[in-house]
Amino acid sequence: MLRYFTSGESHGEALVAFLSGLPAGLTVDQAFVDRELWRRQQGFGRGGRMKIETDKAHFLSGVHHGKTIGSPIAVMLENRDWQNWKESLPVETGDPEKHKRVASPRPGHADLAGALKYDFTEARYVLERASARESAARVAIGALAKLLLRELGVGVLSHVIAVGAVSIADREIAWEQIEPLARKNEVLLSCADADAEQRMKEEVDKVLRTGDSVGGVFEVVAHNVPPGLGSYVQWDERLDALLAAAVMSLQAVKAVEIGSGIQAAHSPGSAVHDEIGYKSDEGFAGFTRTRNHAGGLEGGVSNGQEIRVRGYLKPISTLRRPLQSVDFATREPVKAAYERSDVCVVPAAGVAAEAMVALTLARCALEKFGGDSMKEMKRNFQGYLEQLKNY
């Protein structure tokens, strides 16, 4: 079973991710992993932290001579900014006068809830772990999941469909339009529509001028996923539930949609469900659809269409013009704490969501096809494709 955990704080020495369950013999493309980490750092509206960090994956175990060896993988990402925080956030007791307290909780952040839960007198430790910096570790191991899926012919990418009030959410963007976005070396807002992207930039510019922040919507597309991943037999095996939980787990995501789920709730069934046809030379088993409102999932199982998952991102909760809050110590009204932050992170969140979708699909693929080695897994996968072809 594919299992993963992360550790580390935003301004600590490093982030570490642990991944167990990958088969032996998977080629690890270091340049690809580092490129994924680079993609997460891009996008108009990112803060000053991204000028400090240059994330590179340092594999500590589980990978040798360029391949996985079947044992648990540990990967470390250095936090360069830690050099600026050694005295403020030491492992040992340190000098209390140099500690940087978060004295007033920020509305929308984990500050207050976390301080109450863990009995902290202020929110520094909450901020450190709840920060979206943690998602970099997920992107590193998500890149390995992408490499595994690539061996099965499956691709996972994202694009931005809304920033603030600017939206192209009513259109389905083809995979061929999304692919080039990941190859760009200059990333604006990762939208496939160039005109809409410029309007999105104007939206970010507007909130930059006012000291505010802005959210939006990204869509993750998994291309060439075979039917049969996930299951309807138990609630916790349903692929749509697994994907929703995976994407919702990302910082600032407040809603998840699969296919045209939101529109479907307001439409008659005849306008929602994807009619079925048959052409022997198409798809995995010859069955076709007139559209893909289901987002590639029916009954918790992949149906052979593209899987489409949308994440709805709230605006970042750290504002340069802070909202009203209360001082932890005095309980007196004050402005919420401010710490260097982003203004818009929708493209970066999309990359992190790619990682979560890839990890989820890789887990389901391993459960279905098994294999302690890549050779064994691919042999099992080819046998399943033959079964579908002869259905």
Question: Where would I find each of the regions flagged by the language model?
Answer:
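Generic N-terminal targeting/processing segments that precede catalytic cores or assembly contacts
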Residues: 1-391
